[in-house]
A protein has these predicted regions:
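Short beta-rich binding modules
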Residues: 1-90
């Protein structure tokens, strides 16, 4: 049995947000941006469930923290968050 793993990348440093092409390459397809209540963003593969990508436990935990156990995140994910001073990643 082959173990399939997912990647979770967190970015907090200002000026380091990925380009569209970099985000697409990381998630492996079209990107979907999820706005989280703490003013951060989660970038995921828009068609991840259709492609039967594996569960991403870290991204799913982040989803559950903000929205409860209403969904699961699959495939690679990027979390764009603000740093401790509240500065953004743009």
């Amino acid at each position: 049995m082959t173990k399939v793993t997912t990647k979770f990348k967190e970015i907090r440093k200002a000026g380091t947000a990925p380009s569209l092409e970099e985000a697409q390459a990381f998630v492996g397809g079209l990107v979907e941006t999820v706005h989280l209540p703490d003013d951060s963003l989660l970038i995921i593969n828009e068609e991840g469930k259709l492609e039967n990508l594996p569960l991403n436990p870290l991204a799913t935990a982040l989803w559950h923290k903000h929205f409860g156990p209403t969904d699961e995140i699959v495939g690679n994910a990027i979390h764009l968050a603000k740093d401790a001073r509240g500065e953004g990643w743009s």
